[in-house]
Each structure stands twice: as structure tokens, then as C-alpha cells.
Amino acid sequence: MTILPKKKPPPPDADPANEPPPPGPMPPAPRRGGGVGVGGGGTGVGGGDRDRDSGVVGARPRASPPPQGPLPGPPGALHRWALAVPPGAVAGPRPQQASPPPCGGPGGPGGGPGDALGAAAAGVGAAGVVVGVGGAVGVGGCCSGPGHSKRRRQAPGVGAVGGGSPEREEVGAGYNSEDEYEAAAARIEAMDPATVEQQEHWFEKALRDKKGFIIKQMKEDGACLFRAVADQVYGDQDMHEVVRKHCMDYLMKNADYFSNYVTEDFTTYINRKRKNNCHGNHIEMQAMAEMYNRPVEVYQYSTGTSAVEPINTFHGIHQNEDEPIRVSYHRNIHYNSVVNPNKATIGVGLGLPSFKPGFAEQSLMKNAIKTSEESWIEQQMLEDKKRATDWEATNEAIEEQVARESYLQWLRDQEKQARQVRGPSQPRKASATCSSATAAASSGLEEWTSRSPRQRSSASSPEHPELHAELGMKPPSPGTVLALAKPPSPCAPGTSSQFSAGADRATSPLVSLYPALECRALIQQMSPSAFGLNDWDDDEILASVLAVSQQEYLDSMKKNKVHRDPPPDKS
């Protein structure tokens, strides 16, 4: 700030017309020309207020609105020495305008208000004040979004002679960042929708191909900036209200710094920004960069080599290696979140101790893999049990089928051998008897083999080979081992009267048909475990039933033979 010295008083012999006016309030100047006003919004960017006691220009207190209305003229005021106009120097009225009038006037060079305005501009401009006429002196930039030209807005004239009209004052007074959206809306209306869509597509493709970033769309409701930051920090854009509240609280706590960048009343600005539908701009970005201690990078569509480089970066107070908060700026009015899918950034900047980005996702992945493996192992064990059960059932069915076929084959072989030994002279009754016995034995075998094939399999190897030698029977082949597990034949009834006498035993057709049945009594006296038979009691009942049936069949055959024999010739 430049402190201007006081103007020295003129010597006593000076022209009284050039003497400064006496102390006290100065009457308003005639509305003949544009006045000079010291305005601006208390931004500390060149706007200032005069010191009423010292007569020098000082800094305006922060967070205070610009003064309205004419300023009184105490001694040492700025306009006392800067705007002193000799009486009668103004030749005529001058129309009000927003730019300084040309120097000089009808009253002669150096004698009109032009010279005074030039001197005022030269003196006040050194303090950083923008001088205007008829409306006029405005300082301080207005907030705009990234990519906007930060044009300065003119505040209404204060303490001006012949200030601007009320319409101009109403237009000049407004929000600190309203020009951002006014200019953006005008630009959007002027752009072709097809061109905008094509640019957005190219922008998204360039970020994905060159940086590997993905643009995540945010809801367009005025809180898009806070939604994008919430998505970057919390992973959920619906937490934008929390982000906005923290940001506004941070701005209020640091009002002595951030108020320098606001042209309106800072408290009014904060209260307006607390609304959920109010847009955010670069002041909030800087606050959030400091609040989360993460840089904020803003990407926007552009041409050339900088198409995928951030157009603006806001840094925090402390430098670190954390991933920045990335947002994209679209159509000069909307923000989206730019996500790096290869690096986790959620939770960074929240001040959580020992927090590692992505560690929660890794733990969840490990738990999911472990659960999946356990489920897969249990499923495989169940499938193995099912396959094992089917294999056992298949083996039992195969063993049962082999035992049945082996026993039937043994019966066929024995019948064939008996036919060869019997010869053609044997009666037909023996063949019929053996056939019926074979059928009965087959039916009895099916019932017997339908029980437990495992018990029969225990006798796969003969435990008494000497028994086969005594009986005159050769051991069966391995394929017919199970067929010998039931030695008693149904053709040999245990209660038949034909075996009661020793003489009948030699001439019986059953004995001649089955020579091995002579040892039936010996075999029946042996333990069933020798043949692998544990259900011997059931077999005895079956054998007795078959014996009774055989006896009835033999009796019927004898009766038929008696009826068929012709009566003897009496002649």
C-alpha cells in the first residue's frame, strides 16, 4: 500500500481561489461532471478506505461490505486536495459516462475538471484504486470457475459526485461468483450440442487411453463439485452434504485468509454457500485441498499436448505423496469425478491412523476367496461320496450277477455230465426229474443270492481243499467260486424215503445223476462258515420245502407210470 503525503498549504500570497476549502463538511459538488468514487468490496486487492483522522488511504477491514452513500468531508480528506476545483472553472454541464472525460475543457486547459480528474487518477491509482467517472471505482476480482477469465466487476460508486443511476447500482451489486454461471450459460447456449457431445467423448477417451482414468458421472443438482470430492474421499457422492459442511466450517475458521478473495460480505458468502444447491468454485477447492491435505487437480477438455493434463492444481499446506483429488470440468458449469481404477484413494485425507488405501478391499477379497474355496471343497467331497456310493452299489450288482450266472453254468455242466454217464437206456423220468430239480434250484438260487453278496464273497477261496478230493469233485474255476457256496442241491431231498436204504442208494436215478450227492449228509453236518454261509437256517427251510416238492413230484411220476403200463396178456 502506498501512503500519499499530505498536500502542503499554499503560501500566504497565493491566489485565494486556489486555497483549500475551510474545515467542515463540504457541500456536494454540482452535477456537471463525473465524480470519483473509491469503491471495491473490501478485498485487500487494491480497494481501500480513507483514514478519517490521518487523511491517508488505509486497508479496509475484512468481511465488511463496501460503504454506500456519499462520504462526509472531514479535514484532510482525499477530495480536499485531489478534487479541488477553482470557482467558475467549470464551463458547462458534461454528460455522465463510465469513462474519464478528456482532459481540458471549455474553461481552458488545466482549469477544468479534466485536470483534476487526471490528478486524482494519478494519485489514487498509486494506491491500487481503479478510477471511474459517473459510477465508479471498483476493485477486487470476482470468483470464477477454472478456465474462466477472472474479469473484474465494478462496484457502485461511493462518495461520487453525480453517481450512477439506481439501475446501474442494482446491476453492479450481486453475488461474488454470479458472473461464472452467467458467462457459462451464455457460452453453453452458443455452442452446438453435437460439438459438445463430440468434445466430451474425445475428452473421456483421451483420459482413459493416456492416463487410465475413468470419468464417473455426478448428479447435476448444483452440488456437483462437492459430490465429486465426496466420491473421491468417501467413495459415495451422496455424502456431499458432509463435505460441504466441513468446507464451509473450514472457510469460517480461516476467514482472515479466504476473505481476501471474496468481494461480497464474507459471512453472507458462507451462508449462501451452505445451501445444497449452490455451486462451488476455486475458493472451495483451495479450502478442500488444505482440509484433506491432498492436491485438487481439475481436468478440462482442451486441444494439443495438454489435453490430458490438469488445467489447474490446488495444493494443500503440507506436501505429501497422497493421491490427488481429481475432478473434471464440463461445459464450464459441471464437475465430475475422475477415478483411477488401478489405485485406491478412498479414505485418504480423513486423518485415520494406520490407514492403508485398498487394504479393506484386499481383506474382503481374501475372505471371499476363502469362503469360495471352502464351499468348493465341500461340494467336491459330496460328489466324491456320491460317486463312491454308486461304485459300491455297482460292484455288488456285478458280484450278484456273476454268482447267479456261475451257479447256473455249474448246473448245466452237471446235467450234461449226467446225460453222458446215463446213456440211452436210462428212463425218461430221470431227465424230467433233473430238469425240474434244476428249475427249482435256479429259483432257489435267485432267492438265496438276493441277500448279501458280501457274505458270499468271503468264500471266494475254498477253505477245505481236501473236502473236494474226498468228494471226487474238481475245484471250480475262479469264475465259478461263488457257485459252490451252496453245496446242497435241491435234487437231493433230505426227507426222501429213497435214501433210507443202502441198496436203493446204488440203483436210484438221482444217485446216478449226481454222484456227489452221496456225501450230502456229510456236507450238511459241516459248519456253514466253511462255505461262507451265515444264513444256513433259512437255507435248511428252503431245502426241506424243495424236498417235499420233489417227493410229491416223484410220487406223481410213479402213478403215471402205473397207469401207462399195459395190462399183461392173459392168453
Swiss-Prot record:
Report the residues modified as Phosphotyrosine.
Answer: 175
Tissue spec. comment: Expressed in various tissues, including the liver and placenta, as well as in peripheral blood leukocytes.
Q: Quaternary arrangement and interactors, per the entry?
A: Interacts with TRAF3.
Known consequence of changing residue 549 to A? Loss of 'K-48'- and 'K-63'-linked polyubiquitin chain binding. Partial loss of TRAF3 deubiquitination
Q: What is the effect of changing residue 177 to D/E?
A: Loss of deubiquitinase activity. Abolishes activation by protein kinases
Q: Which family does it belong to?
A: Belongs to the peptidase C85 family.
Residue ranges for the region (Variable-loop) are 273-283
Compositionally biased residues, Low complexity: 84-97, 430-443, 450-462
Q: What is the effect of changing residue 328 to A?
A: Reduced phosphorylation. Reduced ability to promote stabilization of BTRC
Effect on the protein of changing residue 352 to P: In MCAND; in mice embryo the mutation is lethal; reduced cleavage activity towards 'K-48'-chains but not 'K-63'-chains; no effect on nuclear location; no effect on phosphorylation
EC number per UniProt: 3.4.19.12
According to the record, mutating residue 520 to W results in: In MCAND; uncertain significance
Location of region: His-loop: 329-334
The active site is formed by: 221, 224 (nucleophile), 334
Tell me what disease the record lists for it: Multiple congenital anomalies-neurodevelopmental syndrome, X-linked: An X-linked recessive, congenital disorder characterized by central nervous system, craniofacial, cardiac, skeletal, and genitourinary anomalies. Clinical features include poor growth, short stature, global developmental delay, impaired intellectual development, microcephaly, hydrocephalus, hypotonia, congenital heart defects, hypospadias, and other variable abnormalities. Brain imaging typically shows ventriculomegaly and thin corpus callosum.
What is the official name of this protein in its record?
OTU domain-containing protein 5
Q: What is its main location?
A: nucleus
Q: Which GO terms describe its biological process?
A: negative regulation of canonical Wnt signaling pathway; negative regulation of type I interferon production; neural crest cell differentiation; positive regulation of TORC1 signaling; positive regulation of TORC2 signaling; protein deubiquitination; protein K48-linked deubiquitination; protein K63-linked deubiquitination
* Phosphothreonine: residues carrying this PTM: 195, 507
Annotated Gene Ontology cellular components are: cytosol; nucleus
Q: How is it modified after translation?
A: Phosphorylation at Ser-177 is required for deubiquitinating activity. Phosphorylation at Ser-328, Ser-337 and Ser-508 by MTOR promotes its activity.
Q: Which residues form the OTU domain?
A: 213-341
Q: What does this protein do?
A: Deubiquitinating enzyme that functions as a negative regulator of the innate immune system. Has peptidase activity towards 'Lys-48'- and 'Lys-63'-linked polyubiquitin chains. Can also cleave 'Lys-11'-linked ubiquitin chains (in vitro). Acts via TRAF3 deubiquitination and subsequent suppression of type I interferon (IFN) production. Controls neuroectodermal differentiation through cleaving 'Lys-48'-linked ubiquitin chains to counteract degradation of select chromatin regulators such as ARID1A, HDAC2 and HCF1.
The record's keywords, sorted A to Z, are: Disease variant, Hydrolase, Intellectual disability, Nucleus, Phosphoprotein, Protease, Thiol protease, Ubl conjugation pathway
Which InterPro entries does the UniProt record give?
A: OTU_dom, Papain-like_cys_pep_sf, Peptidase_C85-like
